[in-house]
Amino acid sequence: MSKEDMIEFSGTVTELLPNAMFRVKLDNEHMILAHTSGKMRKNRIRVLAGDRVNVEMTPYDLSKGRITFRFK
């Protein structure tokens, strides 16, 4: 799947889950399950509950996503 096919949303991390998973509440009130992207893991960017994040999702499964950016 190419990068152009991904859908981007903004949201807030509501819950930290095991195995580096997060529950994210999107701005459109949907709750999804998300994990951090590889570059965020490599650069050790911490994500905590309450952080504003960008999430990219595939159009095939709108219940899971990947956190690509954490706002300051």
UniProtKB/Swiss-Prot annotation:
Residues 1-72 form the S1-like domain. GO terms for cellular component: cytosol. Gene3D superfamilies: Nucleic acid-binding proteins. Keywords: Cytoplasm, Initiation factor, Protein biosynthesis, RNA-binding, rRNA-binding. One of its GO terms (molecular function) is rRNA binding. Pfam families: eIF-1a. It is found in: Cytoplasm. It comes from the Bacteria. Its main location: cytoplasm. The keyword RNA-binding applies. The keyword Cytoplasm applies. HAMAP family: IF_1. Component of the 30S ribosomal translation pre-initiation complex which assembles on the 30S ribosome in the order IF-2 and IF-3, IF-1 and N-formylmethionyl-tRNA(fMet); mRNA recruitment can occur at any time during PIC assembly. Belongs to the IF-1 family. One of the essential components for the initiation of protein synthesis. Stabilizes the binding of IF-2 and IF-3 on the 30S subunit to which N-formylmethionyl-tRNA(fMet) subsequently binds. Helps modulate mRNA selection, yielding the 30S pre-initiation complex (PIC). Upon addition of the 50S ribosomal subunit IF-1, IF-2 and IF-3 are released leaving the mature 70S translation initiation complex. PANTHER family: TRANSLATION INITIATION FACTOR IF-1, CHLOROPLASTIC. This is Translation initiation factor IF-1. It comes from Gluconacetobacter diazotrophicus (strain ATCC 49037 / DSM 5601 / CCUG 37298 / CIP 103539 / LMG 7603 / PAl5). The lineage of its organism: Bacteria, Pseudomonadati, Pseudomonadota, Alphaproteobacteria, Acetobacterales. The gene is infA.
